[in-house]
From Swiss-Prot:
Keywords: Disulfide bond, Ion channel impairing toxin, Neurotoxin, Potassium channel impairing toxin, Secreted, Signal, Toxin, Voltage-gated potassium channel impairing toxin
Signal peptide (UniProt feature, chain positions): 1-24
Disulfide bonds: C30-C50, C36-C55, C40-C57
Organism listed in the record: Scorpiops jendeki
Function of the protein: inhibits Kv1.3/KCNA3 channel.
UniProt family annotation: Belongs to the short scorpion toxin superfamily. Potassium channel inhibitor family. Alpha-KTx 30 subfamily.
Source lineage: Eukaryota, Metazoa, Ecdysozoa, Arthropoda, Chelicerata
Tissue-by-tissue expression: Expressed by the venom gland.
Record remark: domains: Has the structural arrangement of an alpha-helix connected to antiparallel beta-sheets by disulfide bonds (CS-alpha/beta).
Location in or out of the cell: Secreted
Name of the protein described by the UniProt record: Potassium channel toxin alpha-KTx 30.2
MF terms (GO), sorted A to Z: potassium channel regulator activity; toxin activity
GO cellular component, one term: extracellular region
Note: Negative results: does not block Kv7.1/KCNQ1 channels.
Alphabetical list of InterPro entries matching this protein: Scorpion_toxin-like_sf
């Protein structure tokens, strides 16, 4: 068990990083939120935002947003 656990953690970390990198390839690069409006227009009830260096389409799931 002590020798297998570090291997499992390393493999899981590598898989997460590979998936995250693959998923990010489809994202639109941006420098401000206005560049993301067209990218997010295919979704309904979302707020376009430039987070980091790529567009995110944030969905409000109820509640009060200030």
């Amino acid at each position: 068990m002590n020798k297998v656990f570090p291997f499992v953690v390393i493999v899981a970390t590598v898989l997460i990083l590979v998936f995250d990198t693959t998923d990010a390839k489809g994202e639109k690069k941006c420098s401000n939120s206005e560049e993301c409006v067209k990218f997010c227009s295919e979704y309904s009830d979302v707020h376009p935002a430039c987070i980091g260096d790529h567009c995110e389409c944030i969905r409000w799931e109820g509640g009060i947003s200030i």
